[in-house]
Amino acid sequence: MSNTYKMSANTFRSSILSGIAVGIAGWGYLACRFKGLEILGAVLFSFGLLTVVNYKLKLYTGTAGFVALRKEDGSNRFFRAIRELLFILLGNIVGCMLVALLLRCQSLPLGWKEAQVILEGRLALGPLKAGALAIGCGFIMTTVVTFARQGKPLALLFGVPLFIYCGFPHCLADAFYYMAAPFRTFTSHHIGDILLLYPCLVIGNFIGCNLYRILNIKED
């Protein structure tokens, strides 16, 4: 077994576990919204990012602002970085899907309606506006992860509720919400609308995660 294969397998497993952490955090948030405790839910959502940071898991929005875009010799590796991020994103989505399937095992539809409301709200915004708002989430994510890597995890408890209350979409949280929504939601909206919306959130998060690099001439 080659080292490249082992690294890819480890990365994918890590990204799946990261998606599971985000999915469980999203589940808690939906449950709190269901009970009228949205503020508590926003704080509990921090569990996902705290898990990712402390276990050094691969999360798309926790990696996009730090992945090397250039090699040590200064040559461009942008497209390779994008492939790495999409690989991580795929694993994250798989993890979110596993939790969404588990959520459907409940006897009561706890959080299903709340997930539907979030999905319909994103669709009402449209892909361009939702994608633009996702930039804010990416910026917050890179900021709080930077603080956490410096031994200041308290920033996570502020940053996560902040992007939730600002209405900034997080592409992995949204992936969980969409898969947790009632199946009938997908009969009333064209799947194409969702497939157009989601990449805009991913791109918006990527731009936001890299705002520090975009606006600063100095390389990492």
Name each model feature, range by range.
Residues 1-220:
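Alpha-helical transmembrane segments and their helix-helix packing motifs
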